[in-house]
Amino acid sequence: MDAMTPPAPEQPRPVSLLPVFLIVLVDVFGMTLVIPLLAIYAESFHATALQATMLVSVYAACQLVSGPVIGHVSDRVGRKPMLLISQVGTFIGFIVMAKARALWMLYVARVLDGATAGNLSLAQAYISDHTEPSQRAKSFGLIGIAFGVGFFIGPSLTGYLSAKYGMTTPIYLAAVMSAISILCTATLLKGGPQSHHAFDDREAALRWRTYAKYFGRPGLRERLLQFLFFITSFSLFISGFALFAERRFTYQGHPFGPREIGYVFGYVGLLGIILQGGLIGRLVKRFGEAALVAAGFVALVIGYFGLGIASSFALLMVAGTLAAFGNGVIRPALTSLITQQAGRQEQGVVLGITQSLMSMASVVAPIVGGLLIERQMLKEWAWAAAGLAAVGVALSREGLPFYATASADSIGTP
């Protein structure tokens, strides 16, 4: 090879992604056991709506600090060691939460979990390490399937267990699932390639400089902004839905509780399984990732707006179906577009940044949502989520058919 010829980029190492799927599935199963009851569990310690949603904000604030650092370190030492550390933190957090005797102990549990959080971004980075760019949307769909299965089984099981045995039982079960995920990672997951890219340690320490670097890249900047608005609307929804539904809807004469909320999440999870289990790959081939992202944001706008005006359980499920479709197609398609825009040696950092964007959104959105719900501004809570998704539509211009047609016409105009 000529001395002046740059070396060919290292190709992804093909490995079975089944262990990653199993690990994410177990992790998500544990997480979804807790999501439907977290806010209502906090209310059992006399928390206000704002104090309940701030449990999400505290977790996210810790995750905001740790996200880029975990990404950098995983690029150097490999994904597996950092994934194990993250999972151990989750396990300890669940144990503390289950044994809590006061509201402040719930906050301690969320700090412990958030400080080591990185399971999802590390799993995504592992998939990027071992798949070709053209296959990533389909491969990231595995994470979507895991979320779907977890959201189908976990919340439904939470509803049953909390009604029959009390609200701490699902939390203990979540800790058991976390322990199983640690064993799966230790025994099933193969070590991935380490990055030989010489990162500047000062850049790793100054996270804002890292953000400026990647947000300064055309193409990648728009995708990261889309991800920010997507995850902000999702965080507003997921952190406040239990409190919203508890105050807005009744079932068989009583307000929504963990059981009913769990069943709604279970339905959304079932839709996710159907969508990402077989449709996402065909949809990407037919329409492309950009078009799917645009369609997903449109569905979110309609779904969240409909949630605000829903006056019956049936209308709630219609709005939830649209929102589930939007979330189901945006996450894998947008993650694929982001990793394609980043260099191979930078994928851990970029996915760490997306994890930090999730954290930033999850710091602010639950506080805003908690304030709105506490003031009984339930419609405004749902419409705020719709407005955030509408910004995602505006940033999806190249994926919208009418924009593509207009662009082609303008190019052809002398």
Name each region found by the language model:
Residues 5-14, 191-225, 414:
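Juxtamembrane intracellular "pre-TM" segments in multi-pass secondary transporters
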Residues 81-96, 175, 291-305:
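Structural signature of the two symmetry-related core transmembrane helices
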Residues 109-148:
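Cytoplasmic helix-loop-helix junction between adjacent transmembrane helices
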Residues 290-334:
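C-terminal transmembrane helical hairpin of 12-TM major facilitator-type secondary transporters
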Residues 67-77, 275-288, 373:
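Helix-to-loop junctions at the C-terminal end of transmembrane segments
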Residues 65-101:
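Conserved MFS/SLC helix-loop-helix module at the cytosolic interface between two early adjacent transmembrane helices
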Residues 46, 78, 99-104, 309-311:
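Helix-breaking motifs and short loop linkers at transmembrane-helix boundaries and internal kinks
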Residues 36-49, 240-260:
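Short amphipathic helix-loop junctions that connect adjacent transmembrane helices
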